[in-house]
């Protein structure tokens, strides 16, 4: 992540724009004939951000519903990734875990749309500007969380554990951690620090799910080349963080006692019955989802 981004961002600036583009993709997915996921808050949140180009993306539908996004098949990828993380949280609940932490929550609306079981508490960590925006927007939409939602305003590149504890996080309880669309925007050293902190805060039986990119430079280059009309997300994506590989992430977790597993993105496309990748969509083979459980 570029040094000039160390001061933070909101959904309309910096890397926050990429979270807004992801929400726009979820809005498009929801209008498909048989949507893989339904996020009724995606379009209202994007519209509230107020970036015209992203609002237009969110309001697309039909055969042209993927035009203008960062890379080909991005809507399919966001659909598959979103469903994967939805399934991850639902499975953890079934196994009795009631404490969840969403790292880099952005415009994630899971606390409002997943079928949380009684006693579920969800901590949403993100930059102060992002947290303030989502709190105000969801209040304006009169949206009601389906779990005990506890937003935490903190920078994940700094000391975020104390603010999390202040909000009531209990390290003695098993936790479901998620880092969806986060790690590629952190520098390698910041990634490792986040993984170390997660491990220090986790008890036996805790789980983690995260997506990684093995060649962040190629991703940034492909995004720049694939853009159509001028889009503000292009400039924020140029500051992708030079992140660690999925292998490095898995190794770090294993060093802390986690049992990890990796799945390349094409496996998710197949698992959710999506069309196979074309030759010019090989970039997705460098995107991996890492899951882990603390033994």
Swiss-Prot record:
EC numbers for this chain: 2.1.1.-
Positions of S-adenosyl-L-methionine binding: 126, 155-156
GO biological process, one term: methylation
GO molecular function: methyltransferase activity
UniProtKB keywords: Methyltransferase, S-adenosyl-L-methionine, Transferase
Entry annotated with the keyword Methyltransferase: yes
InterPro entries xref list: Ppm1/Ppm2/Tcmp, SAM-dependent_MTases_sf, SAM_mthyl_Trfase_ML2640-like
Function: Exhibits S-adenosyl-L-methionine-dependent methyltransferase activity.
Family: Belongs to the UPF0677 family.
Protein name: Putative S-adenosyl-L-methionine-dependent methyltransferase Mvan_0910
Naturally occurring in which organism (per UniProt): Mycolicibacterium vanbaalenii (strain DSM 7251 / JCM 13017 / BCRC 16820 / KCTC 9966 / NRRL B-24157 / PYR-1)
């Amino acid at each position: 992540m570029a040094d000039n981004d160390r001061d933070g961002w909101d959904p309309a600036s910096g890397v926050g724009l990429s979270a807004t583009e992801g929400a726009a993709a979820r809005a498009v997915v929801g209008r498909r004939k048989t949507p893989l996921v339904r996020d009724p808050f995606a379009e209202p949140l994007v519209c509230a951000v107020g970036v015209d180009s992203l609002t237009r993306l969110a309001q697309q539908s039909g055969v042209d519903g993927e035009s203008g996004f960062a890379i080909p098949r991005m809507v399919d990828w966001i659909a598959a990734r979103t469903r994967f993380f939805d399934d991850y949280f639902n499975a953890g609940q079934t196994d009795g875990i009631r404490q969840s932490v969403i790292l880099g929550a952005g415009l994630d609306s899971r606390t409002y749309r997943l079928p949380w079981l009684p006693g579920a508490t969800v901590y949403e960590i993100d930059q102060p500007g992002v947290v303030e925006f989502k709190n105000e927007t969801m209040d304006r939409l009169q949206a009601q969380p389906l779990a005990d939602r506890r937003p935490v305003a903190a920078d994940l590149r700094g000391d975020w554990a104390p603010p999390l504890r202040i909000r009531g996080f209990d390290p003695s309880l098993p936790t479901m951690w998620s880092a969806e669309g986060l790690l590629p925007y952190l520098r390698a050293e910041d990634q490792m620090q986040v993984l170390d902190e997660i491990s220090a805060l986790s008890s036996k039986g805790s789980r983690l799910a995260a997506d990684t990119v093995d060649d962040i430079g190629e991703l940034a280059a492909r995004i720049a080349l694939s853009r159509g009309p001028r889009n503000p997300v292009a400039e924020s994506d140029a500051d992708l963080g030079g992140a660690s590989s999925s292998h490095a992430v898995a190794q770090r977790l294993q060093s802390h006692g986690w049992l990890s597993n990796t799945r390349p993105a094409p496996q998710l496309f197949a698992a959710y019955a999506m069309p196979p990748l074309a030759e010019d969509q090989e970039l997705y083979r460098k995107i991996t989802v890492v899951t882990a459980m603390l033994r």
